[in-house]
Amino acid sequence: MRFFIDTANIEEIKEANDLGVICGVTTNPSLIAKEGRDFIEVVKEISEIVDGPISAEVISLEHKGMIEEAEKLSKIHKNIVIKIPMTAEGLKAVKVLSSKGIKTNVTLIFSAGQALLAARAGATYVSPFVGRLDDISQNGLDLIEEIVDIFSVNSIEAQIIVASVRNPIHVLQAARMGADIATVPLKVINQMIKHPLTDKGIDSFMKDWEGASLKL
């Protein structure tokens, strides 16, 4: 499993990139709006930090508008991936963009059927949302397992990005199932780094070292 960071905050992206664990970034209109900055400027700055796929989402809900926006965004940097909502209009846009060699990430997927259609339309990535399904008392990880199985059996090349990740369990279970990528907030990355026994071990080592009056 590979890791993307799910944010439009430049400082968070820099921090995660410095850890050496991420190889891409996903954004959405809500994350961009939260930063209160120009959309294009933010995407350009991200592309200067992370050398990997950067998902930037279209705003139009009509396929012709999606295609126009996608062509504009794709010119920002070679790593730009166009994020398209899972709708009939979105699928039309994905088909056209795929034929032009523009990579797409179909987002807001909540069923295996949606993932399969997106892949067949030509999506480079599909993004099923785990946490939001959990929020309505469904098991989001069940969806990941189902999509992984379907894609494997049918030799589908579209990559699965596990999205709406709320905790390390989402990441680890999805990794065990064989999902390609998890896009996670910095908070979850930090939760995965920490373990109380690691902290305890470091404290013990330092006390022993200082007690022996040793120098490196």
Swiss-Prot record:
The reaction(s) catalysed by this protein are: D-sedoheptulose 7-phosphate + D-glyceraldehyde 3-phosphate = D-erythrose 4-phosphate + beta-D-fructose 6-phosphate
Q: Which InterPro entries match?
A: Aldolase_TIM, TAL/FSA, Transaldolase_3B, Transaldolase_3B/F6P_aldolase, Transaldolase_AS, TSA/FSA_arc/bac
Entries under SUPFAM superfamilies matching the protein: Aldolase
Pathway(s) of this molecule: Carbohydrate degradation; pentose phosphate pathway; D-glyceraldehyde 3-phosphate and beta-D-fructose 6-phosphate from D-ribose 5-phosphate and D-xylulose 5-phosphate (non-oxidative stage): step 2/3
Q: Which Gene Ontology molecular function entries are recorded, alphabetically?
A: aldehyde-lyase activity; transaldolase activity
| Catalytic center residues | 83
> Which keywords are on file for this protein?
Cytoplasm, Pentose shunt, Schiff base, Transferase
Q: Name one Pfam family in it.
A: TAL_FSA
Query: What are the record's GO terms for cellular component?
Result: cytoplasm
**Could you say which EC number(s) this protein's record lists?**
2.2.1.2
Among the GO biological process terms of this entry, one is: pentose-phosphate shunt
Kind of enzyme, top EC level? transferase
Where in or outside the cell it occurs: the entry states:
Cytoplasm
Function text: Transaldolase is important for the balance of metabolites in the pentose-phosphate pathway.
Q: Which family does it belong to?
A: Belongs to the transaldolase family. Type 3B subfamily.
* Protein name, entry field: Probable transaldolase
Protein's organism: Clostridioides difficile (strain 630) (Peptoclostridium difficile)
Q: Which gene encodes it?
A: tal
